[in-house]
């Protein structure tokens, strides 16, 4: 299976079987966002213990890219501190901003492990209009953490 096909399967899996879907009983932080260009919607809730995200829930509707990205993001941030999430967010945004077809190599000692499933979204950067779809959840996350 080619890498691009594998990435497509990862995206479709997260779209069809979104992780952390629903609501939290008593979220410590929440935010929502809409991509006005295509109508994607994300509502995110976080439970925090100190500086660490201990639970996360997401609801939304929209294209497969926005919903899969939000699902992957919730998996990636669970158990992480704000500082770790800021670092992860910066790496995700870097990946989405790169030009060309080259693979992102954020950590040569751990290829494919820095962003995990999120690396499946690398191909989106070839379609600039879709970058906002993939980034919506991350924008909502930043808003929630800024509360």
Report each predicted region and the residues it spans.
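Functionally engaged cysteine thiol sites
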Residues: 38, 63, 133
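Short, thiol/selenol-centered motifs that function as redox-active sites or metal-ligating centers
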Residues: 60-67
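Structured beta-strand/loop patches that form or line metal/cofactor-binding pockets in enzymes
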Residues: 21-55, 59-60
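Alpha-helical support elements that line or immediately flank enzyme active sites
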Residues: 69-81
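Alpha-helical macromolecular-interaction surfaces
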Residues: 67-68, 87
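C-terminal binding/interaction regions
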Residues: 1-22, 80-147
């Amino acid at each position: 299976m080619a890498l691009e096909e594998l990435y497509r399967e990862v995206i479709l899996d997260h779209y069809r079987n979104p992780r952390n879907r629903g609501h939290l009983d008593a979220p410590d932080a929440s935010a929502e966002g809409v991509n006005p260009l295509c109508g994607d919607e994300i509502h995110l809730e976080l439970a925090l213990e100190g500086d660490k995200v201990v639970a996360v829930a997401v609801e939304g509707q929209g294209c497969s890219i926005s919903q899969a990205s939000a699902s992957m993001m919730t998996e990636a941030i669970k158990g992480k501190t704000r500082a770790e999430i800021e670092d992860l967010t910066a790496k995700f945004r870097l990946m989405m901003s790169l030009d060309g077809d080259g693979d992102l190599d954020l950590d040569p000692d751990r290829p494919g492990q820095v962003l995990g499933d999120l690396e499946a979204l690398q191909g989106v950067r070839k379609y600039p209009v879709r970058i906002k779809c993939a980034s919506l959840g991350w924008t909502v996350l930043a808003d929630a953490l800024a509360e």
